[in-house]
Every structure is written in C-alpha cells, then in structure tokens.
C-alpha cells in the first residue's frame, strides 16, 4: 500500500499458466468481486480472461473463447464486470454483437443488449433500390460497439458506447437484455 497515493500495488507472478503464472499479454480491463474474492483481468492480446485469487493474486483459472459461443466475434475481452453469482459480462474488442455473457463456469450464455446499427434515410433509400449484387458491394451497417460495462447494486448491467453519432451513449439493461 502506498500511503502517499492511497493505492495498493499488486504483484502478479508472470510466466506460463502451467508454471502457475499469469501470462498477461496486454491487459485492458479489471474487475474485483468482493463476494467471490476474485480478481478478473480482461486481456484482448491473450484472448483470455484471467481469474486470480483476491488475496494471494495467484492464478486460479483462465477463460478463452467458449466452445459453445455463437457469432463471428473474435474473443478479445476488453472490459469486464462480474455479478454476485459469478456471471461475467464482457465487452469484446470490435464486437458488434453485444456484450458477451458467460456463466460462472465460463460457458457462453448469450449476447446481451445488442446495439442497433444506425442507417440514415438516404442509405435506406439507396439500399431499397439496389440489386442483390450492388447490396453485396455496399458497406455493411454495423451496430456501434460498447466501450465499457459495469453493474449496479440491483444487478442491472450498464454499458457505454463511444459512438459520437449515437443519441444513446449510456445503456441500462434489465435481465432480459432490454435497455
């Protein structure tokens, strides 16, 4: 603990997982669960979420892309939040499919809060006139990706988007995933 800056410096043993280390490649997000006593680190470069013991900071497990995960999203966890029973809510870098929700065991549950793509009236008009071949050549309209995620005390999931053209920048999702 640094009494001047009021920060707690944590030393994490690096190295391979087989040797008991935590091979961080480029961590971007962190979340601590007091309820579960675990520290979660989102590392898009390693394409994993590392779960550490909250007291010893020893690696407990790592979670890669779940085998049952649907969609095209490359599993590059960028931001992370964890609820009281251990469900993980992960913002995946460059994902347009929503927030990835994992079960406490690391299995894929669903995409939460799919953001809707913005198409202006002119684009909509031209798409309606285009042939199938022309539509293939047009740029796809992707939903804005989320930039952060957190939970409130009632279990609602909050997310933000950095899309400057979007009217909605902060989202609050209920258990069904509705804003």
Segments and roles (model prediction):
Residues 1-179:
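Eukaryotic scaffold repeat domains enriched in small/polar residues
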């Amino acid at each position: 603990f640094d009494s001047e800056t009021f920060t707690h410096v944590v030393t994490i043993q690096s190295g391979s997982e087989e040797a008991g280390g935590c091979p961080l490649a480029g961590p971007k997000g962190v979340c601590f669960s007091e309820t579960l006593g675990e520290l979660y680190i989102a590392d898009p470069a390693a394409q994993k979420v590392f779960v550490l013991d909250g007291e010893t900071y020893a690696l407990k497990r790592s979670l890669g892309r779940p085998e049952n995960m649907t969609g095209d999203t490359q599993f590059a966890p960028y931001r992370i939040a964890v609820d009281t029973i251990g469900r993980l809510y992960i913002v995946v870098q460059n994902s347009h499919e929503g927030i990835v929700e994992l079960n406490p065991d690391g299995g894929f549950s669903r995409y939460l809060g799919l953001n809707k793509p913005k198409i202006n009236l002119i684009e909509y008009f031209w798409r309606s006139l285009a042939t199938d071949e022309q539509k293939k050549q047009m740029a796809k309209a992707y939903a804005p990706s989320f930039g952060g995620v957190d939970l409130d005390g009632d279990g609602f999931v909050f997310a933000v988007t950095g899309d400057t053209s979007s009217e909605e920048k902060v989202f609050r999702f209920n258990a069904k995933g509705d804003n």
